[in-house]
């Protein structure tokens, strides 16, 4: 049972808010509202202040000006990328513990019910009944009657099944702890969900479940940031853009926002041109007749008019970024062939775990292939076998003639020397190259000017991803094996990588949970299912239709 939500007037109002970090103004005198049941996407360049808005709403940061007001009964749930310490509980207990107030209310209600069975004065009973009614109302509002069932359903939806409910939370890896942290926030059943990159570390199945849950089960308001374009498009009905010191709202999803933003900018540019033409005429008149006494009144009038005109300013546009892979050397027609490939990993308890067996397939020159499958199917392991990062347990694998393979994974970023600069790192990958060639390659992957002197330990996840890709291209690669290349990249950077891969004349095989990326890029799909590989001779849409995953 889900309690009724807040009524229309119970919104979060952000009124004339101002926040700055040092001398840098994030936004000034900005206003917007979060209405009951609304679905908003928060967008803007890195460092614009998106996460700051979340922290201002939760009270983790203070305003420099303005006001944020909301009903005192409003329950806010905030999911961030800062997981915090988790230990000493099972996965289910950890999720339930986040609803401590709800559980406390349940205990209080039971205690009051027991107390009502005891004789007491009428006044005391009346006071107890009033307190009992208030507690019961809040307990119902928080969804207390189905708390444990909800916690289990959310954990299962995020890929942690009943067999892992009682598993110690500290035994989960970082990515799975992120899922538990997300489950905690969803289970709270808040009035307002603030979600900062909720799809990070989720596979496609969990992303689809989360979309469905937010669409059909959760009736509160949602404000989210996400680098997953399709996730954003399917859920939000309003975009709140943070940038250039302002906050601007657009009705519609992310794709609508992109179109509408361009229309508004063109209109602003046209208005700016007209105003500049008018100002030039007025200033010309003033300059020509300023010295003539007969026109003194007119000149003075026009000077005052100009002083009162509010100048139209054109906000600085985000720099359009683009990189492209150099023309690769031509490989043979058959790039890679696997026959009855199998992989078994040893487990800590001394047993063996079969990841996949009987996997066969052929990758041809120029193909863009996606490897898909449920979490744990062996997608990343298959790519590791292809890239020579691990040996298959059995079967044969043949890399074709003149194939130069480049491999990208999240582990690649961990191997970077944190004390070296971007320039030094690329130089290590191509020691015979001139300074100019190295700088050009760095620039192609958006490291320009002083950026090449940044130390690795100061780079963001997205910057590290770009650097590893740049190092791949330091050699004449014609076969790219990419394991989650879009992780840590924002939407704009994903679009840049997408265009570069679409124009890449070589061969690509990749694992990605970004459905927009897959829809736009791949022309063939390998699905690993129950240890076997099924080829689909068509694009991602074709695969979804043939495999019965149309809702993806």
Annotate each predicted stretch with a short phrase.
Residues 268-290, 295-307, 319-320, 324, ...:
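ABC ATPase nucleotide-binding domains
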Residues 118-121, 286-297, 313-314, 446:
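Short intracellular "coupling" helices and adjacent cytoplasmic loop segments at the cytosolic face
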